[in-house]
Every structure is written in structure tokens, then in C-alpha cells.
Regions:
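RNA pseudouridine synthases
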Residues: 2-216, 298
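Accessory RNA 3′-end/elbow-binding domains used by RNA modification enzymes
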Residues: 1-23, 29-46, 50, 54, ...
Length: 314
């Protein structure tokens, strides 16, 4: 196996987003570790953990893009997942022990009519094996220690839940568009119960997070292969040009206010500026100022004045 090429001579000042297609079997932090070793960035993080048994979209933020992580994490997510009927597990996926079984196998005709009950703002009890905190401790830590975990139902937003396919009598494939805090494993569990059977997730893939979708996905192997093919002296800049999206991609849904070069300089010093122009917004809770299409700062607008809260160094 070829040794993985790395650029370790110095920490690289990289700013932007890499939309990684996380492979099945890796934790999100393991995938992030591989990206760190390839790019050697000064600062890096990810926006939204994926379970090891899930694959798909893992947004990776470099440098100044880490300041925009909350806008990505608060955005909508789309998941495609397979539910296997007839067994419920204590983890609500294939990793756990079977705790209930059923001979009932729902069909497309019985599944479709109940899906609307799971759309909108609904109450959901998270899986016992989840990162939800109970008295300051993670639920999965308590569950692994054999302690009885009782989690309260909490509101979640499901914008769309579609039946995609029924490959055979034992399985059904769904696609869900949902908000922050939704557990797809719990959705599968509750679907099974509502249909008079048991169910657990056997495949899970994330297709969208906030502004990033399938068209943005980059496979880890593609990055590794490109790194190996670089000519001597090309370094990490060639990888950044090939795979890293601009910081502003994460702020597509925010109000953008273009400012002059002089005002941009003031904003970078933390000063508020009066916005000019007939179309300038008067009041906005969250917006970002830009100059020459480059983000300057995130902030708020009150009575026509932009007040920065987080300044970009781009």
C-alpha cells in the first residue's frame, strides 16, 4: 500500500469548505484526521457528526470557515436510509442487540398512508445510544455501562419523509429531510412501531447538510489519489484549488450587504458602519458584510447600521 502523501513542513493557512463523502466504517473524527494529515491546516473542524455505520456528506471547515459552522449545522439535512422490518435493537441500528421481534411485514400500501404523521413538528425520543446528555453524561456512556437510560421526548422538525423503494418484503428505503436534532434511527424505530411491527436502520447515507449537497461531494480516495499525483513543489495549494469551496458558500441563506473598501476596513476593526444605498436593509438579526464578494464579517443590522460580531481575516 502506497504511503499517504502529506504536507507537514508547515501548518497551511487554508480557508474554506471541503464537502467530504465520509466512507462507511470511519468515525467522523477519523475521517477528519485523514484530512488533517493530507492538508496540514492551521485550523479545521467538521459540521455535524456522522455515525461510523453511516456514509455521506460530512462538511469540513478550514480556517476562517470554522466561524460559519453554526449556519451549516443549523441547516436542513437530507438522509436516505434503509429500514429492515421484524426486529428492534437497543441501538436502533445493526450494532445493537435485538430486543423485540415481529412477524409483521408492512407493504408499500400500508407504509405510505402513515408517513404524513411523521412530517411537521413532531415529538421524538432519542435513541438510548445517543449523544444526548443525561445529568451531564452522554446517554451512550450510561447505556454502555448497563444503566437504565430514560430520555424525554423532544420536538423535532421533519420537512419531508418519502418512501423510495421496497426491495423485498423485509426492507424499505426512505428519504427524510429534517432539521437539527433529528435521529433517523429513532424515526425508523417509531415507524416500525406505528406499522405494528419492529424496525431498525440497516443503511444510512446523508445527502445534504445546509447549503451543501450531493453535487459537492468529494471522495476521500479521490483526494488521496490527487495528492499522490502532485508534482514536486505543487504542495497543498493544488489540492485547495481542486477541492476546497469558498468560505461564503456556507452563508448562502444569510443577507449579504456589500460595503466599500473604507467601510470594510472599519468593520475589520470592530466598528459599526452605516449602510448606504436605497436597498440597504434597516434591521436584520444575522447578516454578513462583503467587499468585492469577499466576506468581511458576520453581524447584525439595526436602524441601518451594520454591527460586526465575527470578523473574517481573508
Amino acid at each position: 500500500m502506497a504511503r499517504q502523501k502529506q504536507f507537514k513542513r508547515k501548518k497551511n493557512a487554508i480557508n474554506g469548505w471541503l464537502v467530504l463523502d465520509k466512507p462507511y466504517g470511519l468515525t467522523s473524527n477519523e475521517a477528519l484526521g485523514k484530512i488533517k494529515r493530507i492538508f496540514s491546516p492551521q485550523k479545521v473542524g467538521h459540521a455535524g457528526t456522522l455515525d461510523p455505520r453511516a456514509s455521506g456528506l460530512l462538511p469540513v471547515a478550514f480556517g476562517e470557515a470554522t466561524k460559519t459552522v453554526p449556519f451549516v449545522m443549523d441547516g436542513r439535512k437530507v438522509y436516505r436510509f434503509e429500514v429492515t422490518w421484524g426486529a428492534e435493537t437497543n441501538t436502533d441500528d445493526t450494532e445493537g442487540e435485538v430486543i423485540a421481534t415481529s412477524d409483521v411485514r408492512p407493504t408499500a400500501d400500508t407504509i405510505s398512508p402513515v408517513l404524513s404523521e411523521f412530517v411537521g413538528t413532531i415529538m421524538q425520543v432519542p435513541p438510548k445510544f445517543s449523544a444526548v446528555k443525561v445529568a451531564g453524561e452522554r446517554a451512550y456512556d450510561l447505556a454502555r455501562d448497563g444503566e437504565e437510560v430514560v430520555l424525554e421526548a423532544r420536538p423535532i422538525d421533519v420537512h419531508r419523509l418519502d418512501l423510495v423503494d421496497c426491495p423485498d418484503d423485509n426492507r424499505a428505503v426512505f428519504e427524510a429531510e429534517c432539521g437539527k436534532g433529528t435521529y433517523v434511527r429513532a424515526l425508523a424505530r417509531d415507524l416500525g412501531r406505528r406499522l405494528g411491527t419492529c424496525g431498525h436502520v440497516t443503511e444510512l447515507r446523508r445527502l445534504l447538510v445546509g447549503p451543501f449537497g450531493e453535487e459537492d461531494l468529494i471522495e476521500l480516495d479521490e483526494i488521496l489519489e490527487t495528492a499522490e499525483e502532485l508534482e514536486e513543489g505543487e504542495g497543498v495549494d493544488a489540492l485547495v484549488e481542486e477541492f476546497v469551496l469558498p468560505v461564503r458558500e456556507a452563508m448562502d441563506e444569510l443577507v449579504e450587504v456589500p460595503v466599500s473598501e473604507d467601510d470594510a476596513a472599519k468593520i475589520r476593526k470592530g466598528m459599526a458602519v452605516l449602510l448606504r444605498g436605497r436597498d440597504a436593509p434597516l434591521n436584520t438579526e444575522v447578516a454578513f458584510a462583503s467587499h468585492a464578494s469577499v466576506p468581511v464579517a458576520i453581524g447584525s443590522i439595526e436602524k441601518g447600521r451594520f454591527q460586526p460580531s465575527r470578523v473574517f481575516h481573508l
